[in-house]
């Protein structure tokens, strides 16, 4: 196996020795939806530029996109994303949010184009996402969404 430094180049922040803010690496989906997240997560193009389309991510996104397109074979109406901390659950949900909420921008990204082609789709299906983050609301105040 090749050493990591021969396979990939660390991001500029790492190469420059910049100290890290852990908040930059933990996506808060409610902040993405509210337009308050860091630009790398809020902007669909930048988000997908930084996303590695792993097999698990590709399978989950493909299943949901096919289901939204009305396909029921080899899809599920409910997905259970069970992973450890940092396993990609919120990243998957954020990717889905961008795919349906910012479909034109998302569909122009080369990795998304490949995903759509593999799903037999030319663009993300039209849908209206609803986002509820259970630990980001006050049960006494409630939450209204348009």
Regions inferred by a protein language model and the residue ranges of each:
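Walker A/P-loop-proximal flanking segment of P-loop NTPase domains
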Residues: 1-87, 94, 99-100, 138, ...
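P-loop NTPase motor core
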Residues: 51-52, 79-84, 92-146
